[in-house]
Amino acid sequence: MSRKLEALDRRKARVRRALRAAANGRPRLSVFRSSKQIYVQVIDDVAGKTLASASSIDKALKGELKTGADVAAATAVGKLVAERAKAAGVTKVIFDRSGYIYHGRVKAVAEAAREGGLEF
């Protein structure tokens, strides 16, 4: 494995360890970003189930996104996952940035989810 991927895995493990300690039973809002898309899930770690999810390739966002890899797409995905989480009865989450720095698309997802009504 390359050094960059190993470093990402170490950061991800470190972030998840801190989240597990601070979660207090709250579901986590997990972000995965690739070079072309962004994916967000609300996961209940106690039950091991995904409560809500959204991505830039979602059918609900099909016509309105120019690309799945920009801040505008991340904002739309954040709003969509907030709607779906509220419909599933989730209002408080803990944000899992998955080892990515809190900047750009990751920050846009978090801010849009907050605007959509999720608390973290």
Swiss-Prot record:
UniProt keyword Ribosomal protein present = yes
Q: Check the record and name the Gene3D superfamilies matching this protein.
A: 3.30.420.100
Q: Which GO terms describe its molecular function?
A: 5S rRNA binding; structural constituent of ribosome
- The organism's superkingdom is given as Bacteria
Q: List the cysteine pairs that form cystine.
A: none
Gene Ontology CC terms: cytosolic large ribosomal subunit
Q: Which UniProt keywords apply?
A: Ribonucleoprotein, Ribosomal protein, RNA-binding, rRNA-binding
Its Gene Ontology biological processes?
Answer: translation
CDD domains (UniProt xref): Ribosomal_L18_L5e (cd00432)
Q: Which InterPro entries match?
A: Ribosomal_uL18_bac-type, Ribosomal_uL18_bac/euk
Keyword Nucleotidyltransferase listed? The answer is: no
Pfam families documented for this protein: Ribosomal_L18p
**What subunit structure does UniProt give?**
Part of the 50S ribosomal subunit; part of the 5S rRNA/L5/L18/L25 subcomplex. Contacts the 5S and 23S rRNAs.
The protein's job, in short, is:
This is one of the proteins that bind and probably mediate the attachment of the 5S RNA into the large ribosomal subunit, where it forms part of the central protuberance.
Query: In which family does this protein belong, per the annotation?
Result: Belongs to the universal ribosomal protein uL18 family.
Question: Entry's HAMAP family?
Answer: Ribosomal_uL18_B
NCBIfam families associated with the record: L18_bact (TIGR00060)
This chain belongs to which protein, by name? Answer: Large ribosomal subunit protein uL18
Q: Which organism is it from?
A: Methylobacterium radiotolerans (strain ATCC 27329 / DSM 1819 / JCM 2831 / NBRC 15690 / NCIMB 10815 / 0-1)
